[in-house]
Amino acid sequence: STSYGAILDNPDLLVACLIGDGEAETAATATAWHLNKFINPATSGAVLPILHLNGYKISGPTIFGRMTNRELKSLFYGYGYEPMIVEGKDAVIYEKMASILEDAYQKIISIQKKARSGTVVVSPRFPMIILKTPKGWTGIKKLKGQKIEGNALSHQVVIPNAKTDKVELKALDKWLTSYNFRELFDASKGFVDDIRELMPEEGFKMGSNKHTFGGEQVVKNL
């Protein structure tokens, strides 16, 4: 609902809104899916909802996680969206996601151009993305006979006794070193140059964008 509020009468703004599948089934968010019905693409911006579906919330399965792709597409099509599904368990999913994001962006621009050229667009069907990955993906897969990745357990404190338990400490070390931090950070300047080049310029970072906090900056440096 906050994302949709931000784009009202703000035609140049596109908000990518990431929603977890547990969050998505709560009352307030479940209702907010229908706000697309109040958007005029001629005068307002657009929201690109991204439902991150990993099948579990903090202590159990989610509703969306128990639905087939066909059921998910039917549901969100009924909500007025054009659903696009991305799923996978390996690094290829990043390329798939990049491609789908570009497709979704072009669809949004096409709808807006048509509406702003004077054509009456009734009930525009904006895209939304369903990103399906395992719960706790890239984390600890199993520990002491319990399945962690792909389970609600990955949402808990997985290794509470790593300080004293050698098995848990080894699992923690294997997990964290799998991210190859030495390839990402430099001891003297933090992030390596390849990472720094990907960072947005000042003014374009999410935390400094006025749309993320409702207006011009109200907290200033002393």
Feature-to-residue mapping (PLM):
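Conserved acidic/glycine
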Residues: 23, 46-222
